[in-house]
Swiss-Prot record:
<dbReference type="InterPro" id="IPR036690">
    <property type="entry name" value="Fdx_antiC-bd_sf"/>
</dbReference>
<dbReference type="GO" id="GO:0003723">
    <property type="term" value="F:RNA binding"/>
</dbReference>
<keyword id="KW-0150">Chloroplast</keyword>
<dbReference type="InterPro" id="IPR005146">
    <property type="entry name" value="B3/B4_tRNA-bd"/>
</dbReference>
<dbReference type="InterPro" id="IPR045864">
    <property type="entry name" value="aa-tRNA-synth_II/BPL/LPL"/>
</dbReference>
<feature type="domain" description="B5">
    <location>
        <begin position="319"/>
        <end position="404"/>
    </location>
</feature>
<feature type="binding site">
    <location>
        <position position="382"/>
    </location>
    <ligand>
        <name>Mg(2+)</name>
    </ligand>
</feature>
<dbReference type="Pfam" id="PF03147">
    <property type="entry name" value="FDX-ACB"/>
</dbReference>
<dbReference type="GO" id="GO:0000287">
    <property type="term" value="F:magnesium ion binding"/>
</dbReference>
<feature type="domain" description="FDX-ACB">
    <location>
        <begin position="626"/>
        <end position="719"/>
    </location>
</feature>
<keyword id="KW-0934">Plastid</keyword>
<dbReference type="GO" id="GO:0009328">
    <property type="term" value="C:phenylalanine-tRNA ligase complex"/>
</dbReference>
<keyword id="KW-0648">Protein biosynthesis</keyword>
<dbReference type="GO" id="GO:0006432">
    <property type="term" value="P:phenylalanyl-tRNA aminoacylation"/>
</dbReference>
<dbReference type="InterPro" id="IPR045060">
    <property type="entry name" value="Phe-tRNA-ligase_IIc_bsu"/>
</dbReference>
<dbReference type="GO" id="GO:0009507">
    <property type="term" value="C:chloroplast"/>
</dbReference>
<dbReference type="InterPro" id="IPR020825">
    <property type="entry name" value="Phe-tRNA_synthase-like_B3/B4"/>
</dbReference>
Amino acid sequence: MNFLNKSLIRDSVVLQNRWKIIMKVSLNWLKELAKIEIIDAHSLANKLTQAGFEVEDVEMVNIDGHKDYILDVTSTANRSDVLSMIGLSREVSALTQADIVKTADIPSAGLFDNISTIISDDSLLNCSYYVSAIMDNIVIQDSPKWLKNRLYSCGFISQNLIIDISNYIMLKWGQPINIIDLKKIADTNTESYIEITSNFCSSKQKSVKLDNKDIALSRDVLITQINNNITSIAGIGINQEFHVDQNTKLIFIEAAIFKEAVVRKSSRSIGIRTESSIRQERGLNIDNGRSAYRETLSLLIELTHGKVKATFLKKETENSTLNIDISLKKIQDVLGPIKDNHTVRFLSFDEIENTLKSLQFKITKKDVKKFNVIIPSYRKYDVFREIDIVEEIARVYGYNQFQSKIPKIQFTKHPSSRRNFIDQIRNILRNLGLTELVHYSLVKSKGEINLKNPLIKDYSTLRSSLLEGLINASAYNIKQSNQTVDGFEIGTVFNLKRNKIIETTKLAIILGGSLDIRSEWSEPAHSLNWYEAKGIIENFFRKLNKSIQWVKRESSNDQINFIQNNKSATLTYNNDNIGLFGELNELTSSQFGFNTELFVLEIDLDILQYSDPEINYLSYRIQPYSKYPCITRDLCIVIPKKMQINSLFQLLNQFNDNDLENMTLFDQYSNKLLGNGKKSIGLRFTYRSDHKTLTNLEIDNKQNELQKNIIKKLNLEIRK
């Protein structure tokens, strides 16, 4: 033989970190299984790539004077059926609309006549299919040239006739075949009783030799035994002690299909993946296993002149067929129109039927719109849903044959009142200069509702408040030497109430943290204070047309411990508690590294929207702007600490001066000189007339009258 490229040779053992297997596919062998004489290797590679396979290389080789092309093909993990030449030939015939060459019927006469034992299910654990035979009078000769060429083209080196036949069958049918030297097992021959079992390792069974390595066994490893001798690690490899050699005369042939999860667990436990284990892990087909076993015996009889003396068979489970109902409309809706001479049309039933039949799917038409699809047993691992059939049609027909334009959908449904309400809140807050923030619904801290099996410890609890995310985001910005952001978040929080999880939509706002607040350009910048932050919140509710009441907060009524008691308030709407507003306390600010005041708000949007079934609009006074200038006067008043500023403003408005345009608070402080329970506030009064310019004398008279009313009627002290 003239081997020109040694890169074809592959290792028999694949390392555990290999997640995929690359099949070396001989084009000449493929042409014998499917009628694709016309197509060339590169065109075939393109078709396979478009159908979801990876063709990593196409290489021309010369094997024994014959030119061949070798394709390195990788399939997805769920396509166990294409890990064989038979399976790949089915795929290629569907993609190229070629016929499959019917494999020659393998004679079964004499192969199964001497069934000596039916093996019980209890003896073979985790095994869905098992058949074996004993053959004697074996004469091991040199492998025929055609067999060596087949193996070499697929990356295998010829070892001896028995092993070559085993590898050839695995490449052709995808079914691993174990063949061992039965004479090397003590107390076994064709006449004596043979016990075949598969079970998990016991503590006494320490190791097995595979590929010149001692493999330590654990209780997770499934093994097969003959008369209590470990013959193989189930689905992975044969015990090297029982390998066949040139002197072998009596052999034991075994074809088995084990549960995928068990083989996968055994493979991970010992750290080895083989050609056999990869196929077992992905799932094998009983029909292919039966054909592979029969052809193995046929080749052994033909090439070694051996005779079958006994066979062993586990009662086979029936290959259940999968029936899937699907409608023509479903296929057309998912795939959309196809490209057909600039006209828009959809796949017809005949086109769909031909495509599915090329995949060996059986079609039964129920009516004009629906039909039933029977899935072949070798495709049960990847086609078991309606959408899988749609994907197969698109894959074989050609993804590029469908129009890629996304269809336009006409939405006739109007947004809900809920959606409009949330959008209105977003627009108002954005217009006020706030940035919308979004955080995960899962948080690190332990709360009422914890996940049983979280992927990450940092995200193991459903959040019960939005404030934690906003505070953490501000702290992260500071750590990155960035400024904090005045932001808001609208999201869902979760709480337990009477052992039921209650979902609530809330709004949270965070303000402050930066030194860039100034009322005039000439003033030095300062951080946001309580009154400015409260003014932003009041402005928000005013624009939202919601009349909110500010009530003194009772800290015992909530579990929030990071807000100052004397700088916080409970917000109510129609006498319903909707949330709170306040400044972070010093302990929290120091823990997170905040150097300036930060203010937070959290309210319940469900209560805010649905508290009153009737819409109560705020009353407005509409009047034209005055074209005359304003004049301001400042006044310091000593009031009780418990008096609320809003209450004072309402009392002052009772004096009914039409020229008094506005009152604002600009300062407050308290000390011992003022007396216990008292504080001094600075108020700025703005006067403006609608029909003339006010003089200083007129303003002074109005201000003096106001001071008299404050002293006499309100019994308050004016500080000079």
